[in-house]
Swiss-Prot record:
Entries under Pfam families matching the protein: C8, TIL, VWD
Protein name in the entry: Mucin-6
UniProt organism field: Gallus gallus
Gene Ontology terms, MF aspect: antigen binding; virion binding
Region annotated Disordered, chain positions: 1160-1185
Keywords attached to this entry: Disulfide bond, Glycoprotein, Repeat, Secreted
Length: 1185
């Protein structure tokens, strides 16, 4: 519906009429509703131009008047503007407002003169009123009221809405003007100039044109018809008709274009820019100034001129770089080329960190958390001399099972044994050594009061933070690439296989991965099933308050936000503060970890400790604190033997040291050079953690308290042959007792046990190894572990990408010919990239999920997948409303629980599999990609892709190179410091507003949190227990809680069920089929299709006379059996041992049941509602001759 000129109108039903009035009128609204979805009003001035427009969209009110736009509670705004699902931006020579919410879409356009247009959805047919009519599809009844046909003025009087302080008298009724026929031919000719072949009916526009000419100050002047010709041009453009450049300098000119732009009557509003030169959209053309063909708008520099792509500048951290400029970042050098950064990777050391008691970050930047009490292999490598191995000791540090923390680092080789703990260094014979210490190629010294450094000549550097929390940082040179194993990962640039176990298979959860690298006979690591902050609201508030300094604006940490994303450090800080009884040491440790990361990027955060009272450091012995210090030239010992302490680090070290010109002596006092002493031999003292045994009870010294185990009995009676009992009190053959009992798990690690204390117990006889069920077996009979299950000799398993065979306790794996990776978009803005990076955002725009053709030379993309996200909760969370898949000239749109296909591409093969719960698209781009796209008809969308080319992929789904470290690569090819900067770069529509923060819906809707946590707890329950060891459940549980809190404008249970279904699907991808739905919890009514049939092509269902009981719900197809398609839950009409073959279009039997897997261990119960869908085979061998 539109109005233009001095008072021309065209209703929703295309009825044209004329009316001139200066009162405030309702242009269009939803009738008979107290709170309509929209209410648009307008007022004309005495000059007949539109003086004011009021647009009410629920609580949002936009007022347009006198060339200004204001928003209630915001004030006057600048364009482009985006907030609360509303976008306002220039659109050629006009201004366009687009309101996109989950339940509504509306477009309003105006030109600040005489033109106003509203475009609404068909669902409002028959429900509107105002000057735009009733929108019922019949143009002749728009003026009917209570059964009577009204004239124009009486109809308009009904739409009048006075301002609160006015009474606007209705205009006097005048006789409608009759158009002069003498202008009819001229007007037809003028309209033909605009578009001679346009299918929009011309009669009404000819009439409006005639009226314009006769009402002109000089009757018959053609220039008086410009507004009607412009409206006809707009109507033709909206109908996708050809429109010519009909304006001239002297006829209906709209003025000159700025810079080097040119005028187009029908130009694309999808402006191609340096930031997004491939921008495309479905909007119709409009008139205005545009860049000439072959150029793009420079939206990066300030001049906003049209340039060739080669002339586009680049941007980085708010700075603009000219084409050809170079910049250096950590481990890469980049050159600005066609608006993108063309980067080359440089040799770079690998870094692994152990922080915050329980957090580990691998060489390939994968972060995880675990809670175990044991000695673990941190890193083993063939590049370490003398069979060197780096280990980490984790001990209990509190009462709860999750209060575990790093207590010591061990370096072991055939030549050295070095144990570094809090301010102590032990060597081979548990002898305490005073620092500095040197042994061959290894030098250990204190860099400051807080850090100990181990420097080697073979490419390994270890820096240990001793206070406030014991932490370790490992650095290895590039020669170690692809040659490491252990908790620090395999350093091959691929994040996805960092959980490679000692048995040579990749696990799905951190605890199982960590357990495989135990260097002692310890209990398995335990999972923290609940958020520690959920146990105390006071602790939660305190943790969030203190840790929020990391993310707040105006703090010392803000200066680093553009370089290092503070969000993961904030989350760690909150977790540590709630998990550990000693809160502030862990808070300060978390803040220090962020500051250290910033300093590694060249940004030292001076005085950050002063911003938190409990984090300040008090130095003793007249030492001074520095954020960048070193031991060299600061100790007396460094004067006589500089090689012991003069080894700088590439990351600044903080702590206490002597001021320049002073040196630390043996009393930890700073003295002048002339007063430096000579050191005496190390003093003797008893080590902590030694044990004593009295009457069969063994006690250990832990944190100043005795912790005792055992009972008065003869323990040797519990040992059954071939095991034997070894006592710590009288054993001569093994002074560490059962601590180093030979196990199959230890055999898989390939190293010797590194004991820390003696334990009495039963051990296997020589040559035998203890397996998972406690039996002693020869090494060739050792089982393999995967996903918490045990597999015997010769058994095979199939993972997503490999076929693995168990041999001598280790997996021997062969890569499958085709391996896919998955990107998930689900719920309220959750994304998991192809390489496993997780993030959440609340963007209200169209975003590129994935596309190819991302190289600097910008080849044409063969596919592009775009999500349209809109606001779906009062807290501001956003969800995906539609998905657009572009395959060359072929387009597939997913929206409103259905799909549409337009265009053709003979090079692409695709088929559609329909299910009551999902739509699945199999797409083959020959020579490039095999894709399966799965949509649950709501907010969840999955892209499974395998490729036959090294073509680069980009978008919100990451770059699919196996390394999540660089997944936040922006459109201009540099790696963003945080997810929001990354997300903003992948907007498909550059006029959308940027996202500046992530909403926490549980904080905004606290009354929903308890319900959300209760309903989502099924993910942590016994129902999903069989999957807990295959897929880390905590991210899915947290996403479920967030979505359940945020989904507050209807469909809250649907949001919760969708979130749980995502975890169930992740389990199914790992071969675990979970039957989790019930008639009371997230039910699916597949039985409906047994008694209802489609009535025709319209798709409506009606009750059938016959009842067919074949349709039923299944959580998967062919559980524990072979199935050749992507396995998803749904409504199926095949029997339980059949599946529907889409090629043969009939039910086919599942493959034969494979050999059963070994039962789970006692610590891993199996739910009766669970079955394993992974293929398990048994490898057979020929009998001996």
């Amino acid at each position: 519906c539109s109005t233009w000129g001095g008072g021309h109108f065209s209703t929703f039903d295309k009825y044209q009429y004329d009316f001139t009035g200066t009162c405030n009128y309702i242009f269009a609204t939803v009738c008979d509703e107290s709170s309509p979805d929209f209410n648009i009003q307008f007022r004309r001035g005495l000059d007949k131009k539109i003086a004011r427009i009021i647009i009410e969209l629920g609580p949002s009110v936009i007022i347009v008047e006198k060339d200004s736009i204001s928003v209630r509670s915001v004030g006057v705004i600048k364009l482009p503007y985006a907030s609360n699902g509303i976008q306002i931006a220039p659109y050629g020579r006009s201004v366009r407002l687009v309101a996109k919410l989950m339940e509504m879409e509306l477009v309003v356009m105006w030109n600040n003169e005489d033109y106003l247009m509203v475009l609404t959805e068909k669902k409002y047919m028959g429900k509107t009123c105002g000057m735009c009519g009733n929108y019922d599809g019949y143009e002749l009844n728009d003026f009917v009221s209570e059964g009577k046909l009204l004239d124009t003025y009486k109809f308009a009087a009904l739409q009048k809405m006075d301002d609160p302080s006015e009474i606007c008298l209705s205009e006097e009724i005048s006789i409608p003007a009759i158009p002069h026929k003498k202008y009819a031919v001229i007007c037809s000719q003028l309209l033909n100039l605009v578009s001679p072949t346009c299918s929009v009916p011309k009669d009404g526009f000819v009439t409006r044109c005639q009226l314009d000419m006769q009402d002109c100050s000089e009757p018959g002047q053609k220039n008086c018809t410009c507004s009607t010709l412009s409206e006809y041009s707009r109507q033709c453009a909206m109908s996708h008709q050809v429109v010519f450049n009909w304006r001239t300098e002297n006829f209906c000119s709209v003025g000159k274009c700025s810079a080097n732009q040119i005028y187009e009557e029908c130009g694309s509003p999808c402006i191609k820019t340096c930031s997004n030169p491939e921008y495309s959209c479905s909007s119709h053309c409009t008139y205005g100034c545009f860049c000439p063909e072959g150029t793009v708008l420079d939206d990066i520099s300030k001049n906003r001129t049209c340039v060739h792509l080669e002339q586009c500048p680049c941007t980085l951290n708010g700075e603009t770089y000219a084409p050809g400029d170079t910049m250096k970042a950590a481990c890469r050098t980049c050159k600005c080329t066609m608006g993108q950064w063309n980067c080359k990777e440089l040799p770079c050391p690998g870094r692994c960190s152990l922080e915050g008691g329980s957090f580990v970050t691998t060489f390939d930047s994968r972060s995880y958390r675990f809670h175990g009490v044991c000695t673990y292999i941190l890193m083993k490598s063939s590049s370490l001399p003398h069979n060197g191995t780096l280990m980490a000791i984790y001990e209990k540090s509190g009462y709860s099972h999750s209060e575990t923390s790093l207590s010591a680092i061990i370096y072991l080789s055939t030549k050295d044994k070095i144990v570094i703990s809090q301010n102590e260094l032990l060597t081979d014979d548990d002898e305490l050594k005073r620092l500095p210490y040197k042994s061959g190629d290894i030098t250990i010294f204190k860099q400051s009061s807080m850090f100990i450094q181990m420097h080697t000549e073979f490419g390994l550097e270890l820096v240990v933070q001793t206070s406030p929390v014991f932490q370790a940082y490992v650095k290895v040179s590039a020669q170690f690439q692809g040659r490491t194993l252990g908790l620090c990962g395999n350093y091959n640039g691929d994040t996805t296989d960092d959980f490679m176990t000692s048995m040579d298979i990749t696990e799905g959860t951190a605890s199982l991965f960590v357990d495989s690298w135990r260097a002692g006979n310890c209990l398995p690591a335990m999972e923290r099933e609940t958020d520690p902050c959920a146990l105390s609201q006071l602790n939660k508030i305190s943790a969030e308050t203190h840790c929020s300094i990391l993310t707040k604006k105006g703090t010392v940490f803000e200066t680093c936000h553009a370089v290092v994303n503070p969000t993961p450090f904030y989350k760690r800080c909150v977790y540590q503060a709630c998990n550990y009884e000693e809160t502030f040491p862990y808070i300060c440790s978390a803040l220090g970890s962020y500051a250290r990361t910033c300093s590694s990027m060249g940004l030292i955060l001076e005085n950050w400790r002063n911003s938190m009272d409990n984090c300040t450091i008090t130095c003793t012995g007249n030492q001074t604190f520095s954020y960048n210090t070193q031991a060299c030239e600061r100790t007396c010992l460094s004067l006589s033997n500089p090689t012991l302490e003069c080894h700088p680090t590439d990351i600044p070290i903080e702590g206490c040291n002597c001021p320049k010109g002073m040196y630390l002596n043996h009393k930890n006092e700073c003295v002048r050079k002339s007063h430096c002493p000579c050191y005496l031999e190390d003093r003797k003292y008893i080590l902590p953690d030694q044990s004593t045994m009295t009457g069969g009870i063994t006690c250990y010294c832990v944190n100043g308290r005795l912790s005792c185990t055992g009972k008065l009995q003869n323990p040797a009676e519990s040992c059954k042959a071939p095991k034997k009992y070894i006592s710590c009190s009288d054993s001569l053959e093994n002074k560490y007792g059962a601590t180093c009992a030979p196990t199959c798990q230890m055999l898989a690690t390939g190293i010797e046990c590194i004991p820390t204390k003696c334990e009495s117990g039963c051990v296997c006889a020589d040559g035998l190894y203890e397996n998972l069920d406690g039996r002693c077996v020869p090494p060739e009979e050792c089982p393999c572990e995967y996903g918490g299950l045990s597999y015997g000799k010769g058994e095979q398993i199939q993972t997503e990408c490999e076929i693995c065979t168990c041999r001598k306790g280790k997996w021997k794996c062969v890569q499958k010919s085709r391996c896919s990776s998955t990107c998930n978009l689900y719920g309220e803005g959750h994304i998991t990239t192809f390489d496993g990076q997780r993030f959440v955002f609340d963007g209200n725009c169209e975003y590129i999920l994935a596309m190819d053709g991302c190289n600097v030379n910008r080849p044409l993309s063969s596919f592009k997948i775009v999500t349209e996200n809109v606001i779906c909760g009062k807290s501001g969370v956003t969800c995906s409303r539609s998905i657009s898949i572009y395959l060359g000239n072929l387009t597939i749109i997913l929206r409103d629980e259905t799909y549409s296909i337009s265009g053709k591409n003979l090079q692409v093969k695709y088929n559609v599999k329909k299910n009551a719960l999902h739509l699945m698209f199999d797409i083959i781009i020959p020579g490039k990609y095999n894709m399966t796209l799965i949509w649950n008809k709501h907010m969840n969308f999955f892209i499974k892709i395998s490729r036959e080319t090294q073509e680069t992929i980009c978008g919100l789904c990451g770059n699919y190179n196996g390394n999540m470290k660089d997944d936040f690569e922006t459109r201009s090819k540099y790696v963003a410091s945080n997810e929001l900067e990354f997300v903003n770069s992948w907007k498909e529509n550059p006029l959308c507003g940027d996202v500046y923060f992530v909403v926490d819906p549980c904080s905004k809707n606290p009354y929903r949190k308890a319900w959300a946590e209760k309903t989502c707890s099924i993910i942590n329950s016994q129902v999903f227990s069989a999957c807990h060891n295959k897929v880390n459940r905590m991210p899915y549980y947290e996403a479920c809680v967030r979505d359940s809190c945020g989904c507050d404008i209807g469909g809250d249970c649907e949001c919760m069920c969708d979130a749980i279904a995502v975890y169930a699907m992740a389990c199914l991808d790992k071969g675990i089929c979970i039957d989790w739905r019930t008639p009371e919890f997230c039910p699916v009514y597949c039985e409906y299709y047994n008694s209802h049939r489609k009535t025709g092509s319209g798709g409506a269902y009606s009750y059938g006379s016959s009842v067919n009981c074949t349709w039923h719900y299944r959580p998967c197809n062919c559980p524990n059996q072979y199935y050749k398609y992507v396995n998803i839950e749904g409504c199926y009409n095949c029997s339980h041992d059949e599946y529907f073959d889409y090629e043969k279009e009939k039910c086919m039997p599942c493959a034969m049941q494979p050999t059963s897997v070994t039962l789970p261990t006692a610590t891993q119960p199996t739910s009766p509602s669970t079955s394993s869908a992974s293929t398990v085979l048994t490898e057979t061998t020929n009998p001996p001759v």
